[in-house]
Amino acid sequence: MSKEPLILWLMIEFWWLYLTPVTSETVVTEVLGHRVTLPCLYSSWSHNSNSMCWGKDQCPYSGCKEALIRTDGMRVTSRKSAKYRLQGTIPRGDVSLTILNPSESDSGVYCCRIEVPGWFNDVKINVRLNLQRASTTTHRTATTTTRRTTTTSPTTTRQMTTTPAALPTTVVTTPDLTTGTPLQMTTIAVFTTANTCLSLTPSTLPEEATGLLTPEPSKEGPILTAESETVLPSDSWSSVESTSADTVLLTSKESKVWDLPSTSHVSMWKTSDSVSSPQPGASDTAVPEQNKTTKTGQMDGIPMSMKNEMPISQLLMIIAPSLGFVLFALFVAFLLRGKLMETYCSQKHTRLDYIGDSKNVLNDVQHGREDEDGLFTL
């Protein structure tokens, strides 16, 4: 193959590459009358070797068609109209075009051409601008009517009537003080609680709501007479709850007997309650009267040594476990002593064996030296 056709083919290829633009296209959509910015950036910008221009329509093979604005790498050198501006930093490669107050005639394709030294090195960026009219939006206002309805509810008054609870009654009886036999003291407690809840209409207090206190007579001996009288408030003893419409009576009776010597202190309490019934139509809670308590005085001539006596059964229950614990501790100590003695003896035997082995080794060494001395003598 001759050189001339080869050179011709290379020239055609280079010319085709030159005519083929290296371009990219960006679409920008904005509203008429608003400022528009067409982006164009070049990161490798050099103010000594680069320049650029903006033109209308597609980028041609060289230069800009209908040039709108032109720079020399540092500043704007020429512009077609005052509404075309470069508001970016040109030395840093930001040569984006800003169009102020665009009209419908400004729609179309724009060319950003950055001139780079060398063949076929220019950067071509095509930007398509679409301008639209501002859309009108109709706002509908919804009217809301609010009606307030006021409802008056009937007012009802509930009358609550409570009955005081009966206080616990303790009766202590003792026999004649001149006798030497131990006294028998019996305590009888009667506790009665009544709770009532009346209807909406006022009514009188039902008969079942009255606490009944009935002390049981003692069979152990006569009752001592009262020597002093003390009046206590009823609030410290009674607790009333209004939770149900029925009457609940809770009566508990417990009795416990203590054995005391003939010279022990004797006291007797006797309590009595009185209940006041509410009048019809009253809405307040009936207030119970104050309780009366009668307490007998203390008797003299009681030795303090009799109070500290303890039953033999309780002493045995304390002594027996203590004695068992001591015996168990002695047994454990005996077992541990046997194990310690066994360990000590085994260690001592091991030490004696070790000493015997050491002596045998020393004897063997001495015999070996004597044999060597005999050989040297010979």
UniProtKB/Swiss-Prot annotation:
The record, for Gene3D superfamilies, names: Immunoglobulins
Q: Which UniProt keywords apply?
A: Cell membrane, Disulfide bond, Glycoprotein, Immunoglobulin domain, Membrane, Phosphoprotein, Secreted, Signal, Transmembrane, Transmembrane helix
Q: Which residues cross the membrane?
A: 315-335
Cytoplasmic face: residue ranges? 336-378
For the Ig-like V-type domain, which residue ranges apply?
25-126
Q: Which domain of life is it from?
A: Eukaryota
Keyword rRNA processing in annotation: no
In the UniProt record, which is one GO cellular component term? plasma membrane
Q: What is this protein called?
A: T-cell immunoglobulin and mucin domain-containing protein 4
| Provenance organism | Homo sapiens (Human)
